Amino acid sequence: MISKAIIKKVSIAPRKARLVVDLIRGKEIKVAKAILMFTPKSASSIVLKLLNSAEANLAQNINLKSNDFYISEVYVNEGIRLKRLFPRAKGSGDMIKKRTSHIVLKLSMAKEIKEEIKAKKKEVNIHGTKI
């Protein structure tokens, strides 16, 4: 994992958010953005913003192209439930649970690029001179 983005207390049910998240797991950033743009679900815009945030974190921390990365981990956890009362007949009421989600997205480097960076690091020893 190189870059991570978390969004908490999103007002969408985790079950609905997982439908969108499952579509992009393991995909490259460019492909995932295309999938999210054309997915007609309300969670897709939220996950797209989260992906853009993770990409911005990546650009801020290290100077590598975002094309070299893929979504290694993305999952949806259940957040707090807001309990509301819906009035019914004879003075009674039903409980409505407005569910929220916590979404976590992690980006990692592609395996080929990891191997290239390891090879470059082996050429340079601890003091910064070539072996």
Swiss-Prot record:
Q: Which InterPro entries match?
A: Ribosomal_uL22 (IPR001063), Ribosomal_uL22_bac/chlpt-type (IPR005727), Ribosomal_uL22_bac/org-type (IPR047867), Ribosomal_uL22_CS (IPR018260), Ribosomal_uL22_sf (IPR036394)
Assigned GO CC terms? cytosolic large ribosomal subunit
Molecular function terms from GO = rRNA binding; structural constituent of ribosome
SUPFAM superfamilies for the chain: Ribosomal protein L22
UniProt keyword rRNA-binding, yes or no: yes
Output the superkingdom of the source species: Bacteria
Q: Which UniProt keywords apply?
A: Ribonucleoprotein, Ribosomal protein, RNA-binding, rRNA-binding
Q: Which GO terms describe its biological process?
A: translation
Where is coiled-coil annotated?
none
- Which family does the entry's similarity section mention? Belongs to the universal ribosomal protein uL22 family.
Entries under HAMAP family matching the protein: Ribosomal_uL22_B
**PANTHER family for this protein:** CHLOROPLAST 50S RIBOSOMAL PROTEIN L22-RELATED, LARGE RIBOSOMAL SUBUNIT PROTEIN UL22M
Describe, as the record does, how this protein assembles with itself and its partners: Part of the 50S ribosomal subunit.
What is this protein's function?
Answer: This protein binds specifically to 23S rRNA; its binding is stimulated by other ribosomal proteins, e.g. L4, L17, and L20. It is important during the early stages of 50S assembly. It makes multiple contacts with different domains of the 23S rRNA in the assembled 50S subunit and ribosome. The globular domain of the protein is located near the polypeptide exit tunnel on the outside of the subunit, while an extended beta-hairpin is found that lines the wall of the exit tunnel in the center of the 70S ribosome.
This chain belongs to the protein called: Large ribosomal subunit protein uL22
Organism of this sequence: Phytoplasma mali (strain AT)
Q: Which gene encodes it?
A: rplV
